[in-house]
Amino acid sequence: MHTVFYVSDGTAITAEVFGHAVLSQFPLAFEQITIPFVETLEKARQVRMRIDEQFRQTGVRPILFHTIVDHQVREEVLKAQASSHDFLNTFVSPLEHELGVKAEPRLHRTHGMENRKLYDDRIEAVNFALANDDGITTKEYDEADIILIGVSRCGKTPTSLYLALQFGIRAANYPFIEQDMGVLDLPAALKANRHKLFGLTIAPQRLHEIRNQRRANSRYSSLEQCEQELACVERLFRQEAIRFLDTSSHSVEEISAKILEATGLRRQLY
């Protein structure tokens, strides 16, 4: 098995994201090790020695994905016996030529706090998502960028939090529960903000599996109950012309991207 090292003088998030995207194209398993904040020559030497030791023990050359700004630190890490892939310089040099401007490398620029307003906006969005989770309150819906609606356990909460943390979007979510299913209608707070509504649904069998993990062998988790609730809620979506998405086979990242594409919501953070 190949060992993959993600090394950076910052958080290593960028190296991980790019690396995961590349490795996902291969039907192989990898041992993955992340080493952030390699900011000194001494730390770089330790990383080089660790990579070389891994090679010595396994006999398989490790793969190294790195985003290191400092030239000396980067060169020390690159002495390691590894297949090295530099995401920053791969793109920086061609862009310098295209833009006619020299890059000005700086530590922690990507995921640091250089832009305090963007950071504050993201924290406020996360706080908003938590305060408006699961229909706790509907008083702040006028401040929401989007309101996700659907049955319990269809993916509303993780999607709301991801939209907030990743994009600074104020996402509220509201659940339809069993007691709502008799004559299902939009509550007044949702009607007043119907232009912000976006529905989530899910395959009955998948919902049954998820609910069974939380409350096994209950009416709440029974396949029949899941089928009835979903049929009722999807009927409401169609009657009210509310856009909705089946989350059954999508990750939270994919769900969020599809919502942004469908709604045209502007990504606040990059």
Swiss-Prot record:
Give residues annotated as binding ADP: 150-157
Matching Pfam families: Kinase-PPPase (PF03618)
* Highest taxon listed in the record's lineage: Bacteria
GO terms (molecular function) for this protein are:
ADP binding; ATP binding; phosphotransferase activity, phosphate group as acceptor; protein serine/threonine kinase activity
Coiled-coil spans are none
EC number(s) from the headed UniProt entry = 2.7.11.33, 2.7.4.28
Q: What reaction does this enzyme carry out catalytically? A: [pyruvate, water dikinase] + ADP = [pyruvate, water dikinase]-phosphate + AMP + H(+); [pyruvate, water dikinase]-phosphate + phosphate + H(+) = [pyruvate, water dikinase] + diphosphate
The UniProt keyword set, sorted, is: Kinase, Nucleotide-binding, Serine/threonine-protein kinase, Transferase
TM helices/strands, residue ranges: none
Q: What class of enzyme is it?
A: transferase
- Keyword Nucleotide-binding, does the record have it? yes
Member of which family? Belongs to the pyruvate, phosphate/water dikinase regulatory protein family. PSRP subfamily.
Function recorded in the entry: Bifunctional serine/threonine kinase and phosphorylase involved in the regulation of the phosphoenolpyruvate synthase (PEPS) by catalyzing its phosphorylation/dephosphorylation.
Designated name of the protein: Putative phosphoenolpyruvate synthase regulatory protein
Q: What species is this protein from?
A: Aeromonas hydrophila subsp. hydrophila (strain ATCC 7966 / DSM 30187 / BCRC 13018 / CCUG 14551 / JCM 1027 / KCTC 2358 / NCIMB 9240 / NCTC 8049)
